[in-house]
Every structure is written in structure tokens, then in C-alpha cells.
A protein has these predicted regions:
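Extreme N-terminal starter segment of soluble prokaryotic enzymes
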Residues: 2-7
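Structural alpha/beta surface segment adjacent to cysteine/selenocysteine redox centers
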Residues: 12, 18-105, 185-189, 197-200, ...
């Protein structure tokens, strides 16, 4: 049986995107899909917006990991990005190692078996090739789903012609057949022309279990 690709656009710093990515990997174990992680950027998304100063500082700290992620995808491929993202998330989100993000990103390269010199892409240089690639990848996500959402963005179907939504936001990440059933439901919604949004307020924090 052939598998279909499900793309998930993430900012590596977003804990909710991390949870969604773990669900998608679980779903791939029980359904015939190939997960493909793509990169979007909370920093790009919030450029020019009037934000609370604390949130602005937090957002400005997300450039590096997103730059490195898109650079890995461009130079080493999707599978390498998946390995690095998992290594990064285990340290940054699960382990709570968030004091020196650049060091965490560098350690994740080693964990993922990737060249150490890739870390050079981490440092933000507006307008360089990595910056342009990050903005292009982010724009692809926004073109599919609209500009009033954040990360993650999930996309079903054939690339830019597919159907994309913000989310799903999950905590904890469903496992086993629960992960598969959630995927089934989302794919069913994506098959309905004219369906746009379904939402409820979160009642708890992040559960990384």
C-alpha cells in the first residue's frame, strides 16, 4: 500500500508544535502516512506587530532554532531535520534546557549525527540565504492556511494544492490507535469543501508525557 505525505510546519521553539509533532510520529506507526516536518517562524509571523514587551523578547529569541532547522532541511534533507528536531525537542522542551538555546541547538546536532559546522546558520543575519529560505518556508505555510494563525500548521494533500489547518493542538500527544483515530478525523475534515475551523479553549498546560 502506498503512503501519503502529511506535512507539519513547526517553529522549533513552540511547545505546542512539539506536542503535535510527537502525535504525528505516533500516527505514522499505525497509519500509512509519511510525516514531513517543515519550518515556519514565530519571529517572522510577528514582525511589525505591536506585542507585549515580554512576548516580543521571547519571540525574538526564536530566530536561531528556526534558521538552523530550515538550513538543515535545505542542506541535509527532511530526515535529517526530523532527527535534529527530535534531539532539540528532547533537550529543550522535555528536558527544559532553555538557558542557552544556541548551545542546545549545537548539542542537538551532535545527538542527530549532523555536521557541527551547521550551527553557523543559527546566528541571525537579516537578508542572507538562510533568512530568505526561512521566510519562503514560512510564507508557504501561511499561503496554505491564512495569516491569522500560528504554529503548528498541518497540511494534507499535494503540496501547495493540499488542505491545511492550524493545529491540531494536543496535550498530551495521543499515542497508538488514539493517534491514528485523530489523524483519521482530521483527514475526514480536510475532505469537506467549505470546512474552515473548529476550536475550544484549553483547560490545562503542556503535558509532555
Amino acid at each position: 500500500m502506498s503512503t501519503s505525505t502529511v506535512e507539519l510546519f513547526v517553529d522549533p521553539a513552540c511547545p505546542f508544535a512539539w506536542m503535535t509533532s510527537r502525535w504525528l510520529l505516533q500516527a505514522a506507526e499505525v497509519r500509512e502516512i509519511t510525516p514531513r516536518f517543515r519550518v515556519m517562524s514565530l519571529a517572522v509571523l510577528n514582525e511589525g506587530r505591536d506585542l507585549d514587551p515580554d512576548y516580543r523578547r521571547s519571540t525574538d529569541q526564536t530566530w536561531g532554532a528556526a534558521r538552523l532547522a530550515v538550513h538543515i532541511a535545505r542542506t541535509e534533507g527532511d530526515e535529517a531535520l526530523s532527527r535534529w528536531y527530535t534531539a532539540w525537542g528532547e533537550r529543550y522542551h522535555v528536558g527544559g534546557d532553555q538557558d542557552d538555546r544556541r548551545a542546545v541547538a549545537e548539542q542537538a546536532l551532535a545527538d542527530a549525527g549532523l555536521p557541527a559546522e551547521l550551527i553557523s546558520a543559527y546566528d541571525n543575519v537579516p537578508g542572507d540565504e538562510v533568512d530568505q529560505a526561512l521566510r519562503a518556508s514560512h510564507a508557504e505555510a501561511i499561503d496554505r492556511v491564512g495569516d491569522d494563525v500560528g504554529t503548528p500548521v498541518i497540511s494534507f494533500g499535494d503540496g501547495a494544492e493540499g488542505i491545511a489547518y492550524f493545529g491540531p493542538v494536543v496535550s498530551p500527544a495521543p499515542k497508538g490507535e488514539d493517534a491514528g483515530r485523530l489523524l483519521d478525523g482530521l483527514r475526514a475534515l480536510a475532505s469537506i469543501d467549505g470546512f474552515y475551523e473548529l476550536k475550544r479553549s484549553r483547560t490545562g498546560g503542556i503535558d509532555l508525557s
